[in-house]
């Protein structure tokens, strides 16, 4: 049994890959055989595929490159796929590493100790050992010679499209930095042309000169170059951006297309040598350097300067365009050093350790690459051991030309380091790099134009045949024959494969080796003959029939790429690849899907093919009629991946009948095969609404009044924003009318803007009220001049003379003629209010010119003030109307947002229903036709909703509101600051009020000086009764004191009236303040509502995103299931074919079928387990790395804990010592205190025991009489004197008692301890 099954495993794949006399079969099989290791890799040109006849007759091995080692598969992938990605023949350069050894000039004391000697241009000796390299530069060599050896070839390689790298290696102080960059000031502008310049400025000087020369030389090809540079350093295994030192500890990433790169690294474009010099100066200034005993400015880090040169050229003659990329890496490595020679300590010692470790890892990598190049034996390449090797892996054994400048010191003191450097250079010279030209050639434009022209002719011919012969009975056969011919035309142009697809990971793909000897041996054991040629011919015929029934898809190029990206990832055998064509800008975007149902190996059924193709093409031609054009939506409108803005194109396609006639039918009318799963349409991606270009312009006239502006605002806003468009369906109109009855739709204006506008409105209201209150108080002191009645000059106190009823009637008539009804009503109310509150009247008796002039000026000024107040009141009402309209618009936007939210909920429900339908279709519950009908109805309903949301988008209304408000503000500013605007009127009113006040002040002062009181203040008890006028005699009989007292009483009453008026104003101010607080609370409520709406919208968007992710996971699982089923079926078919060829029949055939099914299931299960174990291995490796990092962090933390514990123990010990010392000090103080108290008590006892002082006794004996009187007082004085002498001791006793208590600094010391 074992011998029976083993050969079968080798023929599970392509049993028909043996030699076939049929050339078409050989061509198709060779195409499958030469397929790249990448599933998504673009196939090479069909005309350039030549079968490989170098394989042995025993085994036909796959021409795929050998699988890369498991350590770094990506490195080898990039090299293996370079040819396939470019699409053209790429020049390959198989060259080794170029090594140049440069000897440092010896110092004065080292001239006699030189141990390195140059014996030829490419050889040197050290300790009687000879080393051979590409070139040797002796100590007398100049910078220009090094440039000619390394820099000039590097520039030419860069222009040719190769990647190039230059490494500077050697011990510290050997001249690496000088070779690469030159002296410290060599990069400045004044030193750019000196002889001491380094390799880098010379390289780029030549590079920019050659770029200019090439551009001028190939100007007809539109050749353009572009250079971008980056500069980084690797210090202590951390990458820092030298152009932006704030970017530290950058991470290295790896990508299939771009390879290895540093994340977030700064790249700057340069155009000339001056720009590049600035970058070099800036980067080298930020590089880490330090002083050692060997080198005063030793580099403490590796630095890498990278320049990417991109060129693009296009040939006008043949339409070919090429894109060439080359990368230049200039690497200045830190020098190796020994602690004995450099005397490094502290940070320098740590840096030296990291540098030596990094160089050791580089040397290990060089050894492995040299061994691989010499022996050809594959082994693990440790690129990831250090940041330097991981970053520069393309330069070391990859796609680059490498030149290495090894700097050595010929002195005896550096013998070991020099010898180590030369051995490193010798091993590096053995490395073999494979540099290729990084060039991408695009397809021939003229060829594609010819293809498009022929395809157009074919399509037009098919349409003409169908239109000219509508009743021809042979039309179905002709149509199917035309479809076959069109398919052959497409295949002849080579459009059956995608032009370019991204490369995928080929991990897990295995290519089987088909052993023909084992097949023949199996046939001999079973007594069967080998496969005959007639079977091969039959298989070729079946292959032809299957290939002729492929699906023809005409789509947009971008959508085709994205579709093939997902579909080709699931196909194992690309037998049924989609045919693709490229469209010009005016070509169709829709798709025609034609597919037939047919079992493998069966004959062709012309009737089914004819019927299906006939139905598809007839549906296509029916789209020419304008009446049905509206019922056939374009594929662009039904494909969910399209932009939301493209949905509006339904109306355009309904009017454009020519476009509808060209476009094929939508995918919902296509016939899908039974054996192929239906194409799953992904859900709509949620896109936040964005304001594009507003085509509405709201213009206001500067001469329109407030009422006219209100009317225009109401007329403009309603029809443009609120009314639905005629293209909306009846259902959407009903829904819109139901929603419009509640509140207006609104989209919230930004919170800060709304708050600012309301705050500005409140300020205007406050200023208006304050100015109104001030004007009212001024009016009430204007002595009845507010009625706009002309004043009369009176010489006598005659009441009848002063009333002037005719003048009053004339004034009233004039006011009626000038003022409108609204202003007249407001003026009458103000006049009535003023008449109610005013109690003062002016009774002029002087006939002088000043009095007459002032009496006529007063009414004019008051009229102007009154007109200004009315005008400002109207402006405020207009402002309030604007605010009310804005509030209504905001409410309308809120309602509209609610409607959009409901539409989103409906769309989400549609997505869920779609998922349910897909699951039902997969389970077989729902038939394919029902699924297509329900899907079409769902898409049409969703299209209506999206169209409704597009036509009534909230942000459109918001934009209009913003534009209207800005225009109104601009208009108000123009009206205020313009000629004869509000500003001029206000200035004129202020001037009139000042003149009026000055008039009253002057008249009152002059009358008081001449005749005393000229004002007669009367008080009216009845508000409606006119105040009485009293005559004032010419001569004053009463005394001045009585007159003054009367005037004082009158002014006191007037002052009380003013106080009551002030109280009323204060009450009104409080009311307004309460109203403002209420409005502020309402504003806060609106803000909270807006925030809640925003949060709800965000939650809805997040839910929609989660729904899309779930659908994507479901679709991925579905695709995986289909791929697994397809692989099982292919395995069964292969085994059936092998059994049919071997002639197995009857029971053996059933056994073979069962065995094939089991083998296929086991194979799929094994692949699944392999993928599972691979993923688990990766996860375990990542967990292991995380665990190692955690263990390292825990070790560091444990060390810190131990240090902290030692510090704590030491602190506790110090605290105990301090407490012991403090207790001892307390004991000493107590002891001293007791001793002192004992001494004090002894002295007091001795003092009390002695009766008197000896001196006093002698005086008493001399003067008995005198001392008899003063005996007792002298004794008391002596006692007091002794007490005074001992008083300091008592004070010290008190201080000691104080010291006995715990001092303030004892606790402080404890805290510090």
UniProtKB/Swiss-Prot annotation:
**InterPro entries xref list:** KIF15/KIN-12, Kinesin_motor_CS, Kinesin_motor_dom, Kinesin_motor_dom_sf, P-loop_NTPase
Q: What residues does ATP bind to? A: 170-177
SMART domains assigned? KISc (SM00129)
Which PROSITE patterns does this UniProt record tie to the protein?
KINESIN_MOTOR_1, KINESIN_MOTOR_2
Which cell locations does it reside in? Answer: Cytoplasm, Cytoskeleton, Phragmoplast
Q: Could you tell me the keywords of this UniProt record?
A: ATP-binding, Coiled coil, Cytoplasm, Cytoskeleton, Microtubule, Motor protein, Nucleotide-binding
Q: Region Disordered: start and end of each range?
A: 1-74, 685-709
Cite the record's Polar residues compositional bias ranges: 17-26, 699-708
Ranges for region Neck: 429-467
Might you report a single GO cellular component term? microtubule
| All copies of domain Kinesin motor, residue ranges | 96-431
| GO BP term, pick one | microgametogenesis
What residue spans carry the region label Microtubules-binding? 298-302, 331-337, 380-384
Instruction: Provide the assembly information.
Output: Homodimer and heterodimer with KIN12A. Interacts with TIO.
| Protein family per UniProt | Belongs to the TRAFAC class myosin-kinesin ATPase superfamily. Kinesin family. KIN-12 subfamily.
**Name of the protein in question:** Kinesin-like protein KIN-12B
Record the organism. Arabidopsis thaliana (Mouse-ear cress)
